[in-house]
A protein has these predicted regions:
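A polyanion-binding, active-site-adjacent surface
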Residues: 1-213
Length: 213
């Protein structure tokens, strides 16, 4: 199938979100990439811009990446759900956690991205991202210490979504979550550099690079 294009996501109606959102928001970054970050869904600013992580959570994520010593341009960044899930409150579009069926509907696009990006490590940021990547709902705090493997062979690391840092109840908790995010990103980056590409991934990319007779 290949990495889904923006026109493909714009026209997607696998769930009801595609008809409500402004546009689909594809992932962004190099292909292949050893490290892939998966968030929950586009926010209001991402929905309008058509790009992932351009709002407050995105700015915090890029600061965390820099602090972890990671070049954001070398990382593929995407979301488990490709359209903005929201509810209207007056004139404001407020974030609404995507339903299980919406995450599952977008699974075909996330699987295609993982196939095309061929990461050695996938970082699932938040519970919804874990559902998208692993197909099961896990508590982030517990999953951070788990050794998870995606069916592609890629390692899966769990961490907090940047928006969870921004929503922290007080400054000490915000500092705690931010430090955990930076630490998890650094550990994932180091693991991605050490890990061997999964045999299945190598075979797939070799097949793509082989000229057709």
């Amino acid at each position: 199938m290949g990495i889904p294009s923006k026109p493909t996501l714009d026209s997607c109606r696998r769930c009801a979100l595609g008809a409500k959102a402004t546009q689909g928001v594809p992932g962004e970054g190099p292909a292949p990439a050893r490290l892939m970050l998966v968030g929950e869904q586009p926010g209001d600013e991402e929905d309008l811009a058509g790009k992932p992580f351009v709002g407050p959570a995105g700015r915090l994520l890029r600061r965390a990446l820099a602090e972890a010593g990671i070049d954001s341009g070398a990382v593929y960044i995407t979301n488990a759900v490709k359209h903005f899930s929201f509810e209207l409150r007056g004139k404001r579009r407020m974030h609404k956690t995507p339903a299980q069926k919406e995450i599952e509907a977008c699974g075909v696009w996330l699987d295609a991205e993982i196939d095309g990006i061929a990461p050695t490590v996938i970082v699932a940021m938040g519970a919804s991202a874990l559902v998208g990547v692993m197909g099961q709902r896990l508590k982030v705090g517990e999953a951070r210490s788990m050794e998870l493997i995606h069916p592609s062979g890629a390692q899966v690391r769990a961490t907090y979504h940047p928006s969870a840092v921004l929503r922290a109840i007080d400054e000490p908790r915000k500092a705690e979550l931010y430090a955990a995010l930076v630490s998890d990103l650094r550990a994932a980056f180091e693991a991605a550099g050490k890990a061997e590409l999964p045999a299945m991934t190598l075979a797939l990319h070799a097949a793509r690079l082989t000229p057709t007779p």
